[in-house]
From Swiss-Prot:
Domain AMMECR1: 29-214
InterPro entries referenced in this protein's UniProt entry, alphabetically: AMMECR1, AMMECR1_dom_sf, AMMECR1_domain, AMMECR1_N, AmmeMemoSam_A, Uncharacterised_MJ0810
Membrane spanning residue stretches: none
Identification of the protein by name: Protein APE_1056.1
PANTHER family: AMME SYNDROME CANDIDATE GENE 1 PROTEIN (PTHR13016:SF0), AMMECR1 HOMOLOG (PTHR13016)
SUPFAM superfamilies per record: AMMECR1-like
Signal peptide: none
Pfam short name (any one): AMMECR1
Source organism per UniProt: Aeropyrum pernix (strain ATCC 700893 / DSM 11879 / JCM 9820 / NBRC 100138 / K1)
Amino acid sequence: MVGGVRIARARGPPIEPEELDDADGEALVRIARRAVEEWVEHGRRLDVEAGGKLGRPGAAFVTLERRSGDGWELRGCIGVVRPVLPLVEAVVTAAVDAASSDPRFEPLSREELDRVRVEVTVLGSMEPLPKKPHERPALVEVGLHGLYVEKPPYAGLLLPQVAVDEGWDPILFLTWACIKAGLPGTCWLREDVEIYRFRAAVWRETEPRGPVVRRDLAREAAAKGVNARVS
């Protein structure tokens, strides 16, 4: 038991997003919500059982958004990048950290719980992009891929929905992924910088404690007129 969470050994191969259905996604969002509320209200980490698909190793991010006027603003986003924990425990860890440890924000308060919606992103395996920089943009599709940039000691990750929400094309996506890693925006043009793409599945509450839906990022990108591929 660590911090009130039973850390079970993850069993089986890492889970891929396409293996999860909407019932799994809703369960993960509800668990993330409970983990946030348990931490904010009682200072305890949620104790969860890791079994079945959700007990396999998984990588996940939890995003918190607070209602602001007619829209939503980011309130916290942290994740477990590598599948080192059972998926359900990765979600609990990410949820607590998003509510308490995102360095961009103060810890979430009790008064905010009714105004915050929860989103869970399950990451797939990392696929390295070619070393030849000119080949990279054509292999990135906005609405399908997220990006992870690494040049030790620097590293940074952008979830696929970020590019959709911001309306970026693949080159802008690569540029901002480099910046996220603390590197120059042109770092994707360097062969010594490792860049990975990954797929993901995203579920979120439509409103605080409300229905849970899967985000269709490709459809969202098309509706916004995003240039999803390099022409």
